[in-house]
Every structure is written in C-alpha cells, then in structure tokens.
Regions:
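An exposed, glycine/acidic-rich loop-and-rim segment of catalytic or binding clefts
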Residues: 1-140
Length: 140
C-alpha cells in the first residue's frame, strides 16, 4: 500500500471506454484476484488541489443511461460489489456478487501514513469541505 502505480497496459486502465466486465476476471493481474474484482482507488489527474474535476463516467449501452462523476477529492474508489453474494435487499430481493458498481470520492487509502499523499488530517478550528457531483442522463 502507498504505491501510485500506472494503469497503462493493465486491466485497471479505463482511460478509454470498455465494459467493466471485459477485464474483471483477468487474475493474471494479482490485485483483481485478491479483491475478486475491482476495489481500488484511482488517482485523479487534477489541475489544482480542491478544484472540481471530472472523475468517472459509466454508460449502460442499450438504453444510453449514464452516470458522470465530478469531485474535489484526489481519488475515486471503484468497487464492483465483489462480496455481495446472496445479500438480501428491499422486499427480499437478493443481489449476487458484482451486481452493482460504486464510485466513491475519497482520499487515498492509508493517507495519514504516507507523506507523499495529499493530507486528510483535519486540525482543530479547520473545516473539511468537499464537493462531489453525480450527473445522470441519457446519451442518444
């Protein structure tokens, strides 16, 4: 933990659009095997700390529905519900593993112990402020 690794040439690379399921079972990439799928923090290419930046987009190809995410946080955790198997939800609905996807705006894991990460320490008298926008729509 604490390494900011490049995504190029790995199943973690979503810089060009492709389906989440296309590479999720590429267990030659050890991190996908350990997490049973995606459960990783992505470092955003931000222009300036605290600025609102484009973070992620997810599109359902048949209907064209999309979710776009913008945030002031330095990272986004991508989680593909790898451990949901048999989870019971509203009105008895059951959810198998990988039946959902989450985009979570956040600081990097283990930030307080990594001096080279943006600080998340909140000292007395200071405020924590962040903005995350989830935009929903339909592409034609």
């Amino acid at each position: 933990m604490g390494e900011i690794a490049p995504v190029e040439g790995t199943p973690m690379d979503f810089r060009t659009p492709h389906t989440v399921g296309e590479r999720i079972n590429d267990y030659s990439f050890r991190q996908l095997e350990i997490g049973k799928g995606y459960d990783h923090c992505y470092v955003l290419n931000k222009r300036e700390a605290g600025s609102l930046s484009y973070a992620a987009k997810c599109v359902e190809p048949i209907s064209g529905r999309f979710l776009e995410m913008w945030t002031t946080e330095p990272g986004v955790q991508l989680y593909t519900a790898n451990w949901l198997s048999g989870f019971e939800g509203y009105k008895g609905a059951t959810f198998p593993e990988r039946s959902a996807i989450c985009f979570e705006a956040q600081h990097f894991p283990d930030t307080p112990n990594k001096g080279h990460f943006p600080s998340c320490v909140l000292t007395p008298g200071n405020e924590y402020k962040q903005v995350t926008i989830y935009k929903f729509g339909v592409e034609k």
